[in-house]
Structures are given as structure tokens and as C-alpha cells.
Swiss-Prot record:
InterPro entries, per database record: Cystatin_dom (IPR000010), Cystatin_sf (IPR046350)
Keywords: Plant defense, Protease inhibitor, Secreted, Signal, Thiol protease inhibitor
Family assignment from sequence similarity: Belongs to the cystatin family. Phytocystatin subfamily.
Protein name, UniProt field: Cysteine proteinase inhibitor 5
The organism's place on the tree of life at top rank: Eukaryota
Primary location recorded for the protein, binned into one broad class: secreted
Signal peptide: 1-25
BP terms from Gene Ontology: defense response
Organism expressing this protein natively: Oryza sativa subsp. japonica
Length: 148
């Protein structure tokens, strides 16, 4: 009985062993071809695990706007931007990306008012929905980018 099972299973195992290197080579070639850090076209197929994703309709996204407000309030609470004594006033989030980590990491570009000046900041916030918690990791003046 065991020899019949051997003769039935052995060819399948042999085929799998022969095909395994081919699939590994295809995966390695695909990973190398998409190693420029950019999102591929086609709806996200082939995305890198843990890569950043642009948030669509940032100004209409309530969660993103609330996180931007949280960052400005937290920045003021920590004593940042006291150059004129009043702190920052949140205007809006103008761009955002997400990254899945242990939770979701949001990369936000925030417009805020200080006196009569509109300033732009880059902030990073980690949200862990199961705790629930959110932590502002950084809040710094944005590097100048064309178009803003």
C-alpha cells in the first residue's frame, strides 16, 4: 500500500521541486524591476509591503483633517512655535500619505497660520486603532516644494 502511495506522490513532488526555482526567479526579477520606490500603475498591484500610499481627496478626508488639527494642537501644547507668543492656528492638511506599520503612520503636510503668515509643516502621526491611541512623532517646517 505504501509503495502505491509513493508512486502516486513522487511525480508531484518532483514537479514541485523543478518549478520552485522558476517561481523564485520570477519573484526576484519582479522585485528588482520595481525597486525605484514609486507606485506602479494598475491599481496598486505589485506594491511593496510597508510602502507609502497617497491619500486621495485630502481636503475632504475628515480623519486626515482631524489628525492635522491634532498635530497643531499637540505642537502648541509642547511649546513649539511660540515665536510671537500665540502659537499656530490650524488651517488644513494639504497633502497626506499613509504607511502600514504597527498601526497606520500618517505623513501630513499641514498649512497653519501664525499671526498673518501661512506656514507649512510636515508632521508624522502614528494611529493605533485597537488601543485607541495616536502619537505625533514629528512636526517640522516643510521643505519648499514647487507648487505650494
Amino acid at each position: 500500500m505504501a509503495s502505491k502511495l509513493y508512486y502516486a506522490v513522487a511525480p508531484l513532488v518532483l514537479v514541485l521541486l523543478l518549478l520552485a526555482p522558476l517561481s523564485s526567479a520570477r519573484l526576484a526579477a519582479a522585485a528588482a524591476a520595481d525597486d525605484d520606490g514609486q507606485w506602479p500603475a494598475g491599481g496598486g498591484r505589485g506594491r511593496k509591503v510597508g510602502g507609502r500610499t497617497d491619500v486621495e481627496d485630502v481636503e475632504g478626508n475628515r480623519e486626515v483633517q482631524e489628525l492635522g488639527l491634532f498635530c497643531v494642537v499637540e505642537h502648541n501644547r509642547r511649546g513649539g512655535s511660540a515665536t510671537r507668543g500665540r502659537g499656530l492656528v490650524f488651517s488644513r492638511v494639504v497633502a497626506a500619505q499613509t504607511q502600514v506599520v504597527s498601526g497606520i503612520k500618517y505623513y501630513l503636510r499641514i498649512a497653519a497660520q501664525e499671526a498673518d503668515d501661512e506656514l507649512v509643516f510636515d508632521a508624522v502621526v502614528v494611529v493605533k486603532a485597537w488601543v485607541p491611541s495616536r502619537e505625533m512623532v514629528s512636526f517640522v517646517p516643510a521643505a519648499e516644494l514647487p507648487g505650494y
